[in-house]
C-alpha cells in the first residue's frame, strides 16, 4: 500500500508508538514528543524529536498537554483493552479543540498466521518502505471499534478515509 503524508497539524504533537521508523517525528520534527513502550524501537527512531519510554495506557503527562495526538500504525500492536485505555489517555492529554489522528490496518486475524502488511510512505521528499506485522490473539481491530472508543471519550469524528487494507481516522476533542 502507498501512503502520502502532508503536514496537516499545527502545534505540539504526541506520537504514540513513535519509535521504529519515527515517521511522524521525521515529518514534524521538534513539534513531536514520541513515546514507545519498547526502548529498542525508540533507539531505532531518528533523533529529530523528543523520545520517551512510556506506556500508552498510562501516559505521564498532565491533562490537556498536547494540541495533537497521533497513532501511526501503532494500535495494531495492542489488545482490545489496551486500545481502549490508550485512546482514553490520548483524549485526556489532548487539549480542548485538539486533533487525534489514527492510521492503522483492519486486522481480522493474526493467529495462527501472522498479519503482515507492506507500506510505502512518502513525505517531505522522502520515501520509506516498511512492513508491519503482528502475531497473536486479541489484536483484531477495525475502524468501527476505534471510532466507538473515541466517541465514548467525547471526541467527534471529522475524517474517515478507507484504504485497501486500512484506514485513517480524525477526531476533534
Each language-model region and where it sits:
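Conserved alpha-helix/loop element of class I SAM-dependent methyltransferases that forms part
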Residues: 1-10
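Class I SAM-dependent methyltransferase SAM/SAH-binding core
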Residues: 14-58
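A short acidic, Gly/Pro-enriched loop at the edge of an enzyme's catalytic core
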Residues: 57-69
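A short SAM/SAH-binding and catalytic strip from SAM-dependent methyltransferases
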Residues: 68-82
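A short glycine-rich, Lys/Arg-flanked "PGG" loop and its adjoining helix->strand segment in the class I
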Residues: 84-96
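Conserved beta-strand signature within the Rossmann-like core of class I S-adenosyl-L-methionine
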Residues: 97-105
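C-terminal alpha-helical "lid/dimerization" subdomain adjacent to the S-adenosyl-L-methionine
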Residues: 105-161
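C-terminal lobe and adjacent flexible extensions of AdoMet/dcAdoMet transferase-like proteins
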Residues: 167-173
Amino acid at each position: 500500500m502507498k501512503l502520502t503524508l502532508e503536514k496537516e497539524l499545527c502545534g505540539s504533537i504526541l506520537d504514540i508508538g513513535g519509535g521504529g521508523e519515527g515517521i511522524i517525528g521525521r515529518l514534524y520534527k521538534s513539534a513531536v514528543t514520541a513515546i514507545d513502550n519498547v526502548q529498542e524501537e525508540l533507539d531505532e527512531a531518528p533523533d529529530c524529536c523528543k523520545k520517551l519510554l512510556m506506556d500508552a495506557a498510562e501516559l505521564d503527562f498532565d491533562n490537556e498537554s498536547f494540541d495533537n495526538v497521533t497513532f501511526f500504525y501503532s494500535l495494531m500492536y495492542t489488545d482490545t483493552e489496551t486500545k481502549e485505555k490508550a485512546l482514553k489517555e490520548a483524549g485526556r492529554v489532548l487539549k480542548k479543540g485538539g486533533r487525534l489522528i489514527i492510521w492503522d490496518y483492519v486486522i481480522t486475524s493474526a493467529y495462527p498466521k501472522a498479519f503482515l502488511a507492506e507500506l510505502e510512505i512518502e513525505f517531505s521528499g522522502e520515501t520509506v518502505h516498511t512492513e508491519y506485522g503482528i502475531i497473536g490473539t486479541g489484536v483484531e481491530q477495525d475502524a468501527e471499534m476505534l471510532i466507538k472508543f473515541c466517541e465514548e471519550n467525547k471526541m467527534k469524528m471529522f475524517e474517515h478515509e478507507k484504504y485497501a487494507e486500512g484506514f485513517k481516522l480524525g477526531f476533534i476533542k
